[in-house]
């Protein structure tokens, strides 16, 4: 849920740009960002990461870009799983989940084509939320740390339980993973003053 919320707020501009202009525009976007940030370094009165701060400010004026049913599931469940199926696999997955959730906690819904595109795009831009959050709030935060954890195929416990002496050093944690690959991306922003190397 934390990752969903962070991506919704801090990756909104990237989501909208890709949705409206396509991924082919990304190199142009990154070049524009680079030029703005280089320009801001030449003038002391302009903040570092000006492009991120400007894009974040402008994104506040764009309406909610996510489907209502996705937000409802965000409110209902802490963890979300996006499964993309095709052909006969669609009905097979639907039948499986209908049976599975008769006896297990959770729920599912079959996305419309539009919802499916938005769900996948939201997951795609989630990685950028971590860097944007840090860029916007940097003066109140410590360093960033990212880990990619590969799990054995039979591992069922994906979520770490850090000892309090480590957990207390972390300001924010964002997790997202690839279940069929058994990889979890764990992103941390440390509290201000914490030595990441230590």
Model regions: which residues?
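Noncatalytic alpha-helical scaffold of FAD-dependent oxidoreductases
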Residues: 1-198
